[in-house]
């Protein structure tokens, strides 16, 4: 059975209440946030607030597939956030394709695929993204990139492959929607690859469970939370928003 976790809609409610009560947490840069500590929910929608950016999601996926640790290799214009966190050489840690496919990180995808192929009931089907040296690697050569995803565990139950995502930190607006798209891609690929190895398996993608140490919304996106609280709509263009958090 899947734990009786919260849904995305319930996460919206908790964040809406935090904003209404002005329960702010100030981050290291002095920016106000609202935050859920120890968030755990079923990722049953592809975004929480805002709207999907399919064009960027596809560009990021292509970069992940390349396994490049350099932001210049992101197709199209390099997003400002990646430029800001990169080292003086334009290098980062958080190419998630590198994290699961590179031999330099012990081929996490292949290890997980082999484990689940040999033992479908295993609790060892896990892809480890981060590493102990991240404590030092995150600020190498002027970098500011402490990988947000720790591990993703895959559990096969009742012919469904469920993903349990474990993160130290996740931005609700930009972070979640892009990370969800990536995790959905990897889950679907894992299902396909396991079925290709033995057509009698007939596995299907199950639930994605999202566990986050700090799930947060930055003040620049408070207007989205407020708009949802008042209307039930998850997105509005900022210039059209008329509330307190303009």
Curated annotation (Swiss-Prot):
Pfam families to which the protein is assigned, alphabetical: Thymidylat_synt (PF00303)
InterPro entries linked: Deoxycytidylate_hydroxyMease, Thymidate_synth/dCMP_Mease_dom, Thymidate_synth/dCMP_Mease_sf
Active-site residue numbers: 148
Top EC class of this enzyme: transferase
Keywords for the protein's UniProt record, in alphabetical order: Transferase
SUPFAM superfamilies the UniProt entry points to: Thymidylate synthase/dCMP hydroxymethylase
Gene Ontology molecular functions: deoxycytidylate 5-hydroxymethyltransferase activity
EC number of this enzyme: 2.1.2.8
Reactions catalysed: dCMP + (6R)-5,10-methylene-5,6,7,8-tetrahydrofolate + H2O = 5-hydroxymethyl-dCMP + (6S)-5,6,7,8-tetrahydrofolate
Family (UniProt): Belongs to the thymidylate synthase family.
Protein name in UniProt: Deoxycytidylate 5-hydroxymethyltransferase
Source species taxonomy: Viruses, Duplodnaviria, Heunggongvirae, Uroviricota, Caudoviricetes
